[in-house]
Amino acid sequence: MELATMGKVNEVLFMNGGEGEISYAQNSSFTEKVASMAMPALENAVETLFSKDFHLLPALNAADLGCAAGPNTFAVISMIKRMMEKKCRELYCQTPELQVYLNDLFGNDFNTLFKGLSSEVVGNKCEEVSCYVMGVPGSFHGRLFPRNSLHLVHSSYSVHWLTQAPKGLTSREGLALNKGKIYISKTSPPAVKEAYLSQFHEDFTMFLNARSQEVVPNGCMVLILHGRQSSDPSEMESCFTWELLAIAIAELVSQGLIDEDKLDTFNVPSYFPSLEEVKDIVERDGSFTIDHLEGFELDSLEMQENDKWVRGDKFAKMVRAFTEPIISNQFGHEIMDKLYDKFTHIVVSDLEAELPKTTSIILVLSKIVG
């Protein structure tokens, strides 16, 4: 089934739920590292809000978009609370209350998410910062909140997901342009790269437009995206995960376990942009100023683990946690164990050549006044 519409992607794009060994909750250590690296940017954003007299408000409204069900969103809430307490002590002022909205698509495991909201995260109403948390299911590519209602928006490793597989990936004769691949690769024709960038441009612009209506003037957004350093989207730094998954799928095709047509017609609804592409889209939109934009690299694997099979297995489980729902929708639930077992073996083989580092982008924006 092709992911050709926003509605279809919204139904199947979510992380593995629960708390089992292939759940996102148990396999989010990499995104936890990314979030930790980006935490100073979020701290600075809260500090900036307080420098603009946002501490005089009765409540600070913050949203975490694409929150999933792992522990990372809890760290975000705790950090915002700590910064609010710190700034209000420095300013000798009464601390505003904190309203946090946790957003993700309808298939997200909100039960596991809210089960993890311990008193250590939210605190009690007698603390300096009274914290209230609400779930907001829905697509962040459209409006989610009333006009001028948000002061702070955070999103980590979510905005690079697309509303649909890129348009225009079939020829006039109806043939697949990206045959045998599920994402941009070195063998992809230029039209595939152009289609992916065009879809990201359209979707990120929709995201910015929706937030421009919801965020108050001078409000802040802190966005962390999976991105790339190179200007070429087919470089291995940005496509190696999808490339290895495509190899695993192709092997199951050769064994007769998957129809070849299913592989040829599947294109992942995700795009890892360059810093220049992100900057260009924000400036074209014109609703926000860029306060900070940087890229940084992290090892894709647990490098302190010496056993390559343990490292490969950890990486495969991490990838399975965020890809299985959308992959199984196309190729069938019944072959997922075989597919990811094959993927693990391919990853371990690739360890001999060393996997490339993963690039993340930190983007801090302020809503333009007027």
Curated annotation (Swiss-Prot):
The gene is TBS. Belongs to the methyltransferase superfamily. Type-7 methyltransferase family. InterPro entries: MeTrfase_7, MeTrfase_capping, SAM-dependent_MTases_sf. Pfam families: Methyltransf_7. GO terms for biological process: alkaloid metabolic process; methylation. This is 3,7-dimethylxanthine N-methyltransferase CkTbS. The lineage of its organism: Eukaryota, Viridiplantae, Streptophyta, Embryophyta, Tracheophyta. The keyword Methyltransferase applies. Its cofactor is Mg(2+). It comes from Camellia sinensis var. assamica (Assam tea). Involved in the biosynthesis of caffeine in cv. Puer. Involved in the biosynthesis of theacrine in cv. Kucha, a caffeine-like xanthine alkaloid with diverse beneficial biological activities including anti-depressive, sedative, and hypnotic activities, improving learning and memory, increasing exercise activity, and preventing nonalcoholic fatty liver disease. Catalyzes the conversion of 7-methylxanthine (7mX) to theobromine but not able to convert paraxanthine to caffeine. Theobromine binds at residues 31, 157, 160-161, 226, 322. Keywords: Alkaloid metabolism, Magnesium, Metal-binding, Methyltransferase, S-adenosyl-L-methionine, Transferase. One of its GO terms (molecular function) is metal ion binding. Its EC number is 2.1.1.159. Pathway: Alkaloid biosynthesis.
